Structure formats: structure tokens, C-alpha cells
């Protein structure tokens, strides 16, 4: 699905009946996060300069869900970054509709967002996700400390707010440079 299809799905989810009722608050809050990040994120000049040199056609599959807080923070940044890679196409795939995620587990779990970059023949070239290294280290540290889940989420989203997508941009820049030998 493209971004418009995804946002339409999200709108329907906000009306109820698609996800568990307990997800309602997450759906609303994450829509605000998604919209804010999509509106405000701007790629750096370095990313734009490097990404314009990518000529090999690729398809980027982003596995996501509207209820996922990490996805609400990362997917809009990913979409904005992809706008600068002229040879890249993308699609959004819902984690809970289909079995694609089962091929890309993170430590045995279905962590999202997950990004799969494929070549023209459909071969996987790269997989990223569900978080930047820095966000994952924060998550792992808090989890190891046994903090309550709501404290973990507050800390992680506080980190996302301060970072403003720059860690993701930096990681993706390094991956693109390595993948395409730029």
C-alpha cells in the first residue's frame, strides 16, 4: 500500500472495529506523532547529496502498524528520506495482515517498523529495524533495569522527540553508502 492507503486504513482504525479497543489511545497519539514527524522532518544536505547518486532501482518495503509507537516515530522519517532516492520505490505492509514479518523476526519477535530493501529481481539487499542502534540500546537498558512499561515508553518517546529522526537519517545514510558503494 502507498502512504494514502495507509493513512486511509489508519482513519478507519480510528473509527473502531479494526484493532482491539485497548489500542484506541495509541492509534490517536501515534497519528499525532506521525503527522508531526512527516510535516517537520527535513533531510540533511549530506543525505540529499549522497542519495541523488543512487541509480540502481530498488523497492523498499516498510512493515508497520498504526498502533506502533516506534513506527509512528520512524516511518514518516523513512518516507521523507526515500523522497530523495530517485531510483527507489516503496510500499507499506501491515505487520498483522499477512506473514511477511515472519521472515524478518527480531530476536524471535515481530518488532516493527522493519525495512526490507530489494533489487529489481526481488532479492533482499538490506534489512533494517525496528529501531536505530541508539534507541535500541536505550530500550534494552531500560528493559534490563526492569522499569515499568509506561516509563520505558515515555523515555523512548522522549528520546525520539529530542533526536528528531537524525539518528535514523545517519544510520540510513551509512547503509545507503555501503549498499551502493557511494
Task: List each language-model region with its residue ranges.
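Non-globular targeting/processing and membrane-anchoring segments
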Residues: 1-58, 84, 95, 102-111, ...
Amino acid at each position: 500500500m502507498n502512504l494514502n492507503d495507509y493513512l486511509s486504513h489508519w482513519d478507519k482504525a480510528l473509527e473502531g472495529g479494526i484493532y482491539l479497543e485497548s489500542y484506541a489511545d495509541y492509534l490517536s497519539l501515534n497519528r499525532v506523532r506521525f503527522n508531526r514527524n512527516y510535516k517537520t522532518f527535513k533531510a540533511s544536505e549530506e543525505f540529499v547529496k549522497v542519495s541523488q547518486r543512487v541509480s540502481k532501482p530498488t523497492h523498499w518495503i516498510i512493515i508497520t502498524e498504526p498502533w506502533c509507537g516506534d513506527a509512528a516515530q520512524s516511518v514518516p522519517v523513512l518516507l521523507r528520506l526515500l523522497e530523495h532516492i530517485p531510483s527507489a520505490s516503496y510500499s507499506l505492509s501491515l505487520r498483522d495482515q499477512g506473514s511477511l514479518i515472519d521472515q524478518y523476526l527480531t530476536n524471535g519477535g515481530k518488532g516493527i517498523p522493519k525495512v526490507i530493501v530489494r533489487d529489481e529481481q526481488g532479492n533482499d539487499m538490506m534489512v533494517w529495524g525496528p529501531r536505530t542502534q541508539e534507541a535500541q540500546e536505550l530500550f534494552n537498558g531500560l528493559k534490563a533495569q526492569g522499569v515499568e512499561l509506561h516509563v520505558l515508553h515515555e523515555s523512548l518517546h522522549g528520546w525520539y522527540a529530542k533526536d528528531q529522526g537524525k539518528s535514523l537519517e545517519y544510520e540510513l545514510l551509512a547503509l545507503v553508502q555501503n549498499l551502493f558503494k557511494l
